[in-house]
Amino acid sequence: RDSSTSRGLGDVYKRQVMNNCAVLLKSYKIIDVFNETRFAKKNFSPDVRFIDMQGANIAPGFIDTHIHGIGGCGTDDFSSDSILKMSEILPQYGVTSFIPTLYSAPKEQMLKAIRAVVDAIGREKGAKILGIHLEGPFISPSRLGVQSAESLSPVDISLMDEFLAAAEGHIINMTVAPELKNMRELALYCISKGIVLQAGHTNATYEQMVEGMQVRILHTTHLFNAMSRMHHRDPGAVGAVFIHPEMSCELIADGIHINPEFIKFLLRCKPLDKLVLVTDSLKTTKQPSGPLIANGDEVYLDKCFYRKSDNVIAGSALTMIEGVKNLVSFGLTLDQAVQMASANPAKIMRREHLGLVAPGYDADLVVFDKDFNIHYTIVKGQIFKQGKTPCAF
């Protein structure tokens, strides 16, 4: 028995993961959540259908705010069909919303990639597309990761205007290097457009990170990776995240991008609501067959993806349900792990109608057992059995 269910409905809402409860859905919304006592007393109308979750956990659907691809489909295909296929695949892994993430690329390719996502929005048959994450091109050439130096651009507001025009208001978040010349002006401009700015692929000093915070660069892309290291004489970008409680950060919980001990240490230093689980997965993640090519590079898989030419980490092979499972294996509670996968990204990306199992929130849920097997994923009230085929009851 989940002891919280006997303490009244308020305690149910405070939990990220629930059992011994009932969730009432109507159309696209959550109408009510019942503990056992209220459920037993409730007289439901005859048209209410009941689905027995057989003791599994019910949690808010996962929100992946940094994902390049999955199942052989990715943003580097420059195709709305690939984005729509990602939408169909992702419920298998508990994802109900995602933000397709674009690499730096020459201008015309970036515009093509942006238009592909825009064309897919509203036509999804699975996970919802929240918008677009631009991971460049205003990033540091000294912290590229596997991005191409030829694809970078000096800070250019006119170029940003072209991106904004192509995106038709759908750019949600953007990774930038705070130390770049003219970044202050660009940051203020982007903030005025409602874009969440993230420090990433950056060689910023601690002081430059603080300057970035002053213009609302308050989120961080894949913490520890592709950014200036923490040193006792210069805390760098990583140190700034640890020192300033207002800074939030993405975490790739595959055990490779960040040592699990550092994730536990981070939890002792940061408020939990500032930590966001992401996959940063490549199109080669769960790819059924064929050569492993991502963003034009041949990659190989060894727990995560590495570029074959120089063995540089290229991205993760993680899914969100695997990330949640890993966080629990690292020592986090299930509630903490799910909050990092749902409520926290919803809050930081300003999507307050997502990320909680409570009345008025979108009917986006994931149902999984103690072994992290997904039984159902529910997107806007549509039920996917084992996250795959939409089903009716």
Regions found by a protein language model. Give the residues of each.
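Single conserved hydrophobic/aromatic residue that forms the stacking wall/gate
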Residues: 1-13
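Histidine-rich, glycine-flanked metal-binding segment
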Residues: 14-59
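Divalent metal-dependent hydrolysis catalytic cores, especially in the metallo-beta-lactamase
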Residues: 68, 84-113, 127-140, 167-179, ...
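Active-site gating loops and adjacent loop-to-helix segments of metal-dependent hydrolytic enzymes
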Residues: 88-99, 140-168, 210-223, 234, ...
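Active-site core of metal-dependent hydrolases
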Residues: 161, 165-287
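His/Asp/Glu-enriched, well-ordered alpha-helical/loop segment
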Residues: 236-249, 255, 267-279, 284-361, ...
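C-terminal cap of metal-dependent C-N hydrolases
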Residues: 347, 357-393
